[in-house]
């Protein structure tokens, strides 16, 4: 699994998950995780925080998802953006599946000369609360097909 649980000194009662750079043997800075594969972690405690950026695409089920006490109703086609350190809470029983594109800031910084590139992305600005958008069915289908293709064929190589 690509999540590491560690004790968070600032928020002792909230699990913190760390990006696992060597999941496939060599170092990586980006990964795609299928939501149904992380439910076992959410069964322990659906409230958690991450040390990396997360763009979650919901493909099945409807429910609620909260980030830093801001609750969002989500359904298939919704995309949720979150930053490191935000407190997240999943409605794990109703949000059935989807994909999370997870990455560290180092991933984007390695491709762009601007060290603050990720902060310039509107959904990841330091003072902005998390955001949710809804994609049209045709756009979400294309994105999910691409994610599925890369997840199955590229990450398994």
Predicted regions and their residues:
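Conserved hydrophobic/aromatic beta-strand scaffold that supports enzyme active sites
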Residues: 32, 55, 79-81, 100-102, ...
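Generic protein-terminus/edge-of-domain signal
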Residues: 1-66, 70-73
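Well-ordered beta-strand positions in beta-sheet-rich domains
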Residues: 71-73, 87, 132
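A hydrophobic/aromatic-rich effector-binding and dimerization subdomain
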Residues: 3-4, 11-27, 91-154
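Short beta-strand His + acidic residue motifs that chelate non-heme Fe in jelly-roll/DSBH
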Residues: 64-66, 82, 87-93, 99
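Short, charged/polar surface micro-motifs in flexible loops or helix N-caps
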Residues: 38, 60-62, 85-87, 105-108
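Short acidic-glycine-tyrosine-enriched beta hairpin
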Residues: 69-83
């Amino acid at each position: 699994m690509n999540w590491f649980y560690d004790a968070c000194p600032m928020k002792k009662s909230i699990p913190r998950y760390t990006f696992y750079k060597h999941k496939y043997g060599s170092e990586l800075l980006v990964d795609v995780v299928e939501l149904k594969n992380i439910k076992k972690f959410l069964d322990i405690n659906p409230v958690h925080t991450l040390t990396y950026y997360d763009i979650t695409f919901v493909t099945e089920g409807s429910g609620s998802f909260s980030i830093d006490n801001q609750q969002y109703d989500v359904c298939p086609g919704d995309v949720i953006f979150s930053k490191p350190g935000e407190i997240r809470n999943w409605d794990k029983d109703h949000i059935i599946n989807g994909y999370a594109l997870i990455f560290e800031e180092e991933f984007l910084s390695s491709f762009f000369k601007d060290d603050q590139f990720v902060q310039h992305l509107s959904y990841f600005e330091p003072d902005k609360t998390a955001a949710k958008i809804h994609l049209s069915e045709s756009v979400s289908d294309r994105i999910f097909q691409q994610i599925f293709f890369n997840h199955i064929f590229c990450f398994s190589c």
